Amino acid sequence: RVRYTREADFLGKGTIVCVERTENKVPFHVVSRQGELSLQSDRLEVRVDLNTCALTYKDARTGKVLLYERQEMPREAEKTYMENVVYDPDSRRSEKTADGEKEVMDVLRRDTVGWTWKCRNHFRWSEGEALYGLGCHMEDFLDLRGKTMYLCQHNLKEMVPVLNSTAGYGLLFDAGCGMKFHDGPEAGFMEL
């Protein structure tokens, strides 16, 4: 499990997806090398670049790289303010949209009610690697390579924040929020 925050401590209560394990913890040892820290279990090795904090995941038995984060900026976070939008009930009207007739109202005011973080985790996938998952969508493709997906619960879409790779690993994004997946020519990211 990898966790990230820009705060001194993790905020909130988390989600119900990942729960702390109190038994059967995976034994591992730490190896310190020049500019790098390596956490090794019998099956997985996670290398941490001490300059950029970029992570590299390797199969401990074969040495094969499973996944690595973009070296120059593995993750980024931006503080975002949350608003409560108050609408003018006297402006209620119907408008025709692509989704059919919708009831709309004018915005009366926007109240700032708090803040949160918008985070991006940047990855570099292997050549020829296919990525599957992230739920049930209406698109006509399975492999997510080269695609952009906006992940949220919707009438015709179901979001499941799990990404599976033909390279032999899977990622669960335990964020409890809408997300954006993007894979471009240089690298990909998951935005939470």
Residues of each region from the PLM?
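A low-complexity, Ser/Thr/Gly/Pro-enriched, surface-exposed linker/loop concept
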Residues: 1-39, 75-78
